[in-house]
């Protein structure tokens, strides 16, 4: 079938995003984690003491969706009061262990993903994608 949609960058991006997200979700599911959970764990590891609201802003996740996401990570994250209202988040020892396993999955997946891109386009891929969402 002819597909005139392939001439639209937005369509191509959506197809690529759907295909790669499904593949990564399957791999992370094998270790009992979701992409959003791994993203949160990675950001907390890089920013100990970060608040849930700051995580939500960074990831584009509404507050109503952050609450259950953080609930699923109980035991992997710890909360510590920052002031009267805010709590900072940090990884627990089990959280660091799970993140290490997740990072191995993500890094292997990302290496395979970039290997699919022709060598002459690899250096331009991330800057081009970033230009679309920054």
Where are the model-predicted features located?
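Short helix-to-turn junction characteristic of helix-turn-helix DNA-binding domains
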Residues: 13, 44-48
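N-terminal leader segment of winged-helix/HTH proteins
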Residues: 1-31, 88, 93, 97, ...
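Alpha-helical residues within the helix-turn-helix
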Residues: 57
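Short alpha-helical "packing" element that flanks the helix-turn-helix/winged-helix DNA-binding module
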Residues: 40-41
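Helix-turn-helix DNA-binding motif, specifically the short coil turn and the N-cap/start of the second
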Residues: 62-65
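Helix-turn-helix DNA-binding elements, focusing on the entry/boundary residues of the two helices
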Residues: 52
